[in-house]
Amino acid sequence: MSDLTSAASVLAAALAVGLAAIGPGIGQGTAAGQAVEGIARQPEAEGKIRGTLLLSLAFMEALTIYGLVVALVLLFANPFAG
């Protein structure tokens, strides 16, 4: 693998993980804040809100895991290296 390909792969892996974490991080913070607000307004709906929140957080976290998988592929099973 050439030095340029290796450097580009490391940079792309870092960008993949970093950018994949930004969106879900913002979304998870917003969702958790709205859930706390909803529970404060309707305490009797706490169980339903919490269940929906946890499911939503799991789906959001999956996006970050996809970014990590892309980064690992670029670092260890690089399709661009000859």
Swiss-Prot record:
- Principal subcellular localisation of the protein: membrane
Which segments cross the bilayer? 7-27, 57-77
As for membrane topology, the entry says: Multi-pass membrane protein
Query: Mind listing the UniProt keywords for this protein, alphabetically?
Result: ATP synthesis, CF(0), Hydrogen ion transport, Ion transport, Lipid-binding, Membrane, Thylakoid, Transmembrane, Transmembrane helix, Transport
For whether the record's keyword set contains Transcription regulation, the answer is: no
By its UniProt entry, which InterPro entries does this protein fall under?
Answer: ATP_synth_csu_bac/chlpt (IPR005953), ATP_synth_F0_csu (IPR000454), ATP_synth_F0_csu_DDCD_BS (IPR020537), ATP_synth_F0_csu_sf (IPR038662), ATPase_proteolipid_c-like_dom (IPR002379), F/V-ATP_Csub_sf (IPR035921)
Function (record text):
F(1)F(0) ATP synthase produces ATP from ADP in the presence of a proton or sodium gradient. F-type ATPases consist of two structural domains, F(1) containing the extramembraneous catalytic core and F(0) containing the membrane proton channel, linked together by a central stalk and a peripheral stalk. During catalysis, ATP synthesis in the catalytic domain of F(1) is coupled via a rotary mechanism of the central stalk subunits to proton translocation. Key component of the F(0) channel; it plays a direct role in translocation across the membrane. A homomeric c-ring of between 10-14 subunits forms the central stalk rotor element with the F(1) delta and epsilon subunits.
Its recorded name reads ATP synthase subunit c
Organism of origin: Synechococcus sp. (strain WH7803)
